[in-house]
Amino acid sequence: MDVPGISRPVLVVLIVVAAVIFLYGAGTALSRVTEHTETQTRTFAAASTVVIATNSADVKIVASDRSDVRVTTKEQRSLWGGGHVRMRGNAGGLELRDRCHGLPVVEDPCHVRMLLEVPRSTSVRVDTATGDVRAENLEGGADLSSGTGDTHVIGVRGPVRVQAQTGDVDVEAPAPDISVQTATGDVAIVASHAQTIHAAAATGDIVLVVPNLTYAVDAQSDAGDDKVLVHVDDASPRKLRAHTNTGDVIVSSDAP
């Protein structure tokens, strides 16, 4: 077939491009129509410290009245593929291998979520490459590491340790000992029983909110404002340290 003014090689290229666009659109539409979530549940014997390693799953750990550990995974899939999960190990060292299967020319849903219900006294250690992490109401400690993703710690009573390469970190907990470090992301800590808080960010704002008491405070921003709005006494046993290279630092009390 010849089209006046368009050479045959150019026409072939245009036809191929049009076909690819059509296939992409049709495939993506079919993917959306057939999108669904598959759920798996497994139980493990309890461990004093539950250790989780994942590739790209969102991980949520909640304290419960269970005597064992229940793990629920939700895999988002479609006709063309999607998220797949394989668990290996036990509660003391559980490895979650999550990956995506699908067609490279189709926008396919691929997402994995993981929920762990653990005894209240449990401590947790989580290491994820990409994904959000959330820990709630543990009486033990939380040691959370994320390459890319936001981290949320709510109601944890034991020591809190968070390391994130890229992502915001929010902590609202009675934990007396809290340490947060992020390369890129904001840090917000509301500590109702603060004894020692260390917060550091290469790029991002840091906000600390603590009870209306006296603290030894080390707050510094290399390129931003730093405001200390609490009672300061360098001899206080309660230590607050907040450093950021680029961003603001605010240390305030929860007093009205």
Language-model features, listed with the residues they occupy:
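Short, T/G/N/S-enriched strand-turn elements that build extracellular solenoid repeat scaffolds
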Residues: 40-41, 58-63, 84-86, 113-117, ...
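Short, surface-exposed interaction patches in beta-rich subdomains
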Residues: 160, 168-256
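Terminal targeting segments of Actinobacterial cell-envelope proteins
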Residues: 1-9
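Hydrophobic membrane-insertion alpha-helices, especially the h-region
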Residues: 8-28
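Beta-strand elements of well-folded, non-transmembrane domains
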Residues: 56, 75-77, 130, 148, ...
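Non-cytosolic head/periplasmic domains of membrane-anchored proteins
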Residues: 97-183
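Membrane-spanning beta-strands of outer-membrane beta-barrel proteins
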Residues: 44-45, 109, 235
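Short linear S-[DN]-x-LW-Φ motif typified by the pepsin-like aspartic protease active-site region
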Residues: 11, 30-93, 113-117, 123, ...
